[in-house]
Amino acid sequence: MKFFSYILVYRRFLFVVFTVLVLLPLPIVLHTKEAECAYTLFVVATFWLTEALPLSVTALLPSLMLPMFGIMPSKKVASAYFKDFHLLLIGVICLATSIEKWNLHKRIALKMVMMVGVNPAWLTLGFMSSTAFLSMWLSNTSTAAMVMPIAEAVVQQIINAEAEVEATQMTYFNGSTNHGLEIDESVNGHEINERKEKTKPVPGYNNDTGKISSKVELEKNSGMRTKYRTKKGHVTRKLTCLCIAYSSTIGGLTTITGTSTNLIFAEYFNTRYPDCRCLNFGSWFTFSFPAALIILLLSWIWLQWLFLGFNFKEMFKCGKTKTVQQKACAEVIKQEYQKLGPIRYQEIVTLVLFIIMALLWFSRDPGFVPGWSALFSEYPGFATDSTVALLIGLLFFLIPAKTLTKTTPTGEIVAFDYSPLITWKEFQSFMPWDIAILVGGGFALADGCEESGLSKWIGNKLSPLGSLPAWLIILISSLMVTSLTEVASNPATITLFLPILSPLAEAIHVNPLYILIPSTLCTSFAFLLPVANPPNAIVFSYGHLKVIDMVKAGLGVNIVGVAVVMLGICTWIVPMFDLYTYPSWAPAMSNETMP
C-alpha cells in the first residue's frame, strides 16, 4: 500500500518520464526529421491533453526539442513565440483592463437586462444577450465571473418575492403571521439572507485572462446547505447558471479577439497563407455573427424548454399586470444600476475608445469598399488589426483618468497629480502571459512540422479522404474537435489540430478555410462538463448544478452549435470566401472547382 501511495503522490512526475521514454523509439528507430518532429508533437500533445505539466511550460518544449533534433535553429524557434497575435492581444487587454477597472462592463450588463423587461423568459434572454455582447470584447472567463453575481442577486430577489407572496396568502387565510416565511425585503446583496460576497478560485485553469476568480455568493449560515424553498427556485438558479456559462462562450465566437482560439487560428492562418487578404476582423464578424446569433437563440429556446417548459402564451402576453416576482426582479436590477451612479468621465472615455477601436477594425479592409488601409497602398498588408489595437491601447496609458486641474478654496486654479486611465501594473494583472506563451508554442510546433516535412507527410497520408464528400470531411473534423475540447483546453485543441487540418485541405484540393473555419468555431463548443472550460467551472462553483445537469443541457447546445456551423459553412459563408474553389493563395495546386 505504501508503494502505491508513493506512485499516487508522484504520478505527474512518473507520467512525464514514462511518456518521454515510451515514445523514444520513434525517433531512434526511424531516425528521420519527420519522425523526430512527430516525437516532439506527440510529447507536447500528450502533456497538453493531460496537463501533466502546466500548459505554458509544455508550450516551451518545442524551443528545446526542435533545435536538439536539428529541425530548426534556436533563433528561428524563438521568433515564433512573439508574433502579430501577441501585439493584438496586448492592445485588447489594455481595453479590457480599463473596462473592468471603471465598471463599464457592469453598467452595460445591467442596462441591457433592464431593456428586455422582467418576464422570466425574456430576463434570461437579456442576461444571455448582455453576457454574449460583453464576451465579444472581454474574455469569456471574466465575463462569466462578472455577470454571475448580478444574476444571483436578481434570482434571489425573485425567490424572496415568491416566499413573500406565500407568506401573505397564508396570513390572509389563517388570520395570523407566519414568521417562518418572513423574509428580508432588502435588495442589498449584503442583507439578503445574511449573505456575503467572497472570491472563490476555480483551481486548475489558466484561460483567456489568466487566473480565474469568480465572485461567489455563499451562505453565511446553513441556508445554502438546506438548499432551496421550492423546486422552481432551484430550477431557476440552474437555468441562470447555464445561460451565463454558455452565452459567454457563444459570444466569444463573434470576433477574432473574442476568444483565444479565434486569435490562434487567425495568426496561424495569416502565417501559413500570407498572400491571403480575405481574413480580418470585419470579414470574421460578418460570417460569425449570424452563426453566433442563431446558436444563442436556439440555445435559449432549448434551455427554456428543458428547465421551465416553453409557454408561448405566457412569454408573449401583452398588457398584463406584472407579478410581484417581476416587480421585485425589476427593482433589484434598477437598484444595482443606481448604485453605479451617473456615468463618469472615465467610463465615457473608455466607451469612446472602445467604439473607435471597433470602427477602425471594421473599416480597415471591409472588402466591399476600400478601407483606410488603402491610404498606405505602397505598403499593402503592413497595417493589421494589431496596429489599431496598439494605437488605442497606447491612449489608455496617455489619457488622464481625471481632470488635470482643480480650484482651491481661494478660487485659484492649480494642477494636481496626473494619472492615466490604466497603469502598467494594472495591465500586467490582466495580461494572460500564459496564453501568450501557449500560443507561441503552438506556432513553434507548426513551424517545426513545416520545416521537417511532417505536415506534408500527414497531408499525403490523409489524401484518401478526398474521396469523401467535402461536407462529410468537415463534419468529421468538427465532431473530433468538439469531442476533444471537452477534456482538453480550447487553445491546446486548436493548436494541435491546425497543423493537421491545413495539410489535409491542401492534399485533397479543398479551400483551407472550408475546413479550418468550422473546426475553429467548434473548438469553443465545450459545454458538457464543468472542467471543459473556465466559464463552466465558474457557474458550477456556485453549487446549484450537478454534472448531469450540465451534460444534459450541454449536449443539446453542442448539437445546435455543430448544426448551425454546418449550415453556415454550406450557405452564407461560401460566397464570402469562394469556398468551392481552391484559392491561388494556397500552395501550388491546379485551380479546381469542387463537384
Swiss-Prot record:
The record ties this protein, via PROSITE patterns, to: NA_SULFATE
Q: What biological-process GO terms show up in the record?
A: sodium ion transport; sulfate transmembrane transport
Q: Name one GO molecular function term.
A: monoatomic anion:sodium symporter activity
Under the heading InterPro entries, the entry gives:
Na/sul_symport_CS (IPR031312), SLC13A/DASS (IPR001898)
Transferase found in the keyword field: no
What does the record say about its membrane topology? Multi-pass membrane protein
Is the keyword Methyltransferase in the record? no
State what protein this is by name: Solute carrier family 13 member 1
Query: What function is annotated for this protein?
Result: Sodium:sulfate symporter that mediates sulfate reabsorption in the kidney and small intestine. Can also mediate the transport of selenate and thiosulfate.
Subcellular localization: Apical cell membrane
Task: Summarize what activates or inhibits it.
Answer: Inhibited by thiosulfate, selenate, molybdate, tungstate, citrate and succinate.
Which residue positions carry a glycan here? N174, N207, N591
Q: Where are the transmembrane segments?
A: 13-33, 41-61, 77-97, 108-128, 131-151, 239-259, 290-310, 348-368, 381-401, 464-484, 491-511, 512-532, 554-574
Q: Which family does it belong to?
A: Belongs to the SLC13A/DASS transporter (TC 2.A.47) family. NADC subfamily.
What UniProt keywords apply to this chain's record, in alphabetical order? Cell membrane, Glycoprotein, Ion transport, Membrane, Sodium, Sodium transport, Sulfate transport, Symport, Transmembrane, Transmembrane helix, Transport
**Organism superkingdom:** Eukaryota
Reactions catalysed according to its record: sulfate(out) + 3 Na(+)(out) = sulfate(in) + 3 Na(+)(in); selenate(out) + 3 Na(+)(out) = selenate(in) + 3 Na(+)(in); thiosulfate(out) + 3 Na(+)(out) = thiosulfate(in) + 3 Na(+)(in)
Q: What is the lineage of its organism?
A: Eukaryota, Metazoa, Chordata, Craniata, Vertebrata
Q: Which GO terms describe its cellular component?
A: apical plasma membrane; plasma membrane
The free-text tissue note of the record is: Highly expressed in kidney; not detectable in the other tissues tested.
